[in-house]
Design a protein with these regions (language model features):
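Blade-level signature of beta-propeller repeat domains, shared across WD40, Kelch, NHL, RCC1
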Residues: 118-132
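Thr-biased low-complexity repeat/linker tracts and other Thr-enriched repetitive architectures
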Residues: 48, 52-54, 58, 62-71, ...
Length: 135
């Protein structure tokens, strides 16, 4: 039987659900996360599983979009910066290495024009704003 839990303050705005973990984004732009954390995908600066919602280690109230895949999490802040954390085999965090990150870090690509991001089981794809002319 499903269990009801007390949500953090605010209305749910966006969420991402994986097989073993969950991230909610609430109005006010805070990220709350819980579930399996073996690869640091909760962003809590450790690998301890959580049965109750906690905010990411980076905290803050300026998250615009959240997504994830496999065992990593991706998010864009309202200033357009791209943040990513968790499992990093294959270099899927975009940090120019394969080191697991237990807290949110910016990608190697940097920049502040990120518009959308999504993660797969072993990859990440993101759209960065560019000026172009179609023909």
């Amino acid at each position: 039987m499903p269990n009801q839990f007390l949500s953090p303050e605010g209305d749910l705005e966006n969420y991402f659900v994986d097989e073993y973990w969950l991230i909610d984004q609430y109005v006010g732009d805070q990220l709350w996360t819980w579930g399996q954390n073996a690869q640091g995908q909760l962003g809590t600066n450790d690998t301890t599983d959580r049965s109750t919602p906690v905010t990411t280690f980076a905290g803050g109230t300026d998250w615009k979009q959240v997504s994830g895949g496999g065992s990593h999490t991706t998010a864009i802040k309202t200033d357009g910066t791209l943040w990513i954390w968790g499992w990093n085999d294959f270099g899927l965090l975009g940090t120019n290495d394969t080191t697991q990150r237990n807290t949110p870090v910016t990608t190697f690509a940097g920049g502040t024009n990120w518009k959308q991001v999504a993660g797969g089981s072993s990859h990440t794809i993101a759209i960065q704003s560019v000026d172009f002319t179609g023909f």
